Amino acid sequence: MADQLTDDQIAEFKEAFSLFDKDGDGCITTKELGTVMRSLGQNPTEAELQDMINEVDADGNGTIDFPEFLNLMARKMKDTDSEEELKEAFRVFDKDQNGFISAAELRHVMTNLGEKLTDEEVDEMIREADVDGDGQINYEEFVKVMMAK
């Protein structure tokens, strides 16, 4: 499954993995998964976190290592009912729920994920996605960016 990913995708997932893997030991624990999900405004129970880990924990050691994480991401990318997931992700970014992601909202979420971005980097991300040039990202633009990944 993971062998269908491009080098770019793998590099991107490695970066995402290291955001989860707070102590850098090469494994994501339920605690680390919970921390990241809470920073994204989710509030999973301990049981839900354990279920998520069990779903991809191929070797049964109770944590997710990078190959297991890659398999999860490859499966999620094949998941065609991702419309709901995209809407959910958009809502996480669109803090004031006005239908647009502003530079401030983007910076806020990225900071919560542990990504310290300069104003220039945030503006660049907005510019890349901002098809109609209004300085913010609407849902259609968001979907385009997410599907291009």
From Swiss-Prot:
* Keyword Iron recorded: no
Q: Which residues carry this modification: N-acetylalanine?
A: A2
Q: Which UniProt keywords apply?
A: Acetylation, Calcium, Metal-binding, Methylation, Repeat
In this chain, Ca(2+) 3 is annotated as bound at D94, D96, N98, E105
Sequence positions bearing N6,N6,N6-trimethyllysine? K116
GO molecular-function annotation terms? calcium ion binding; enzyme regulator activity
Q: Which residues form the EF-hand domain?
A: 8-43, 44-79, 81-116, 117-149
Q: Which PROSITE patterns match?
A: EF_HAND_1, EF_HAND_2
Q: Does the keyword Transferase apply?
A: no
Q: What does this protein do?
A: Calmodulin mediates the control of a large number of enzymes, ion channels and other proteins by Ca(2+). Among the enzymes to be stimulated by the calmodulin-Ca(2+) complex are a number of protein kinases and phosphatases.
Protein name as annotated:
Calmodulin-2
Q: Which organism is it from?
A: Glycine max (Soybean)
Q: Which gene encodes it?
A: CAM-2
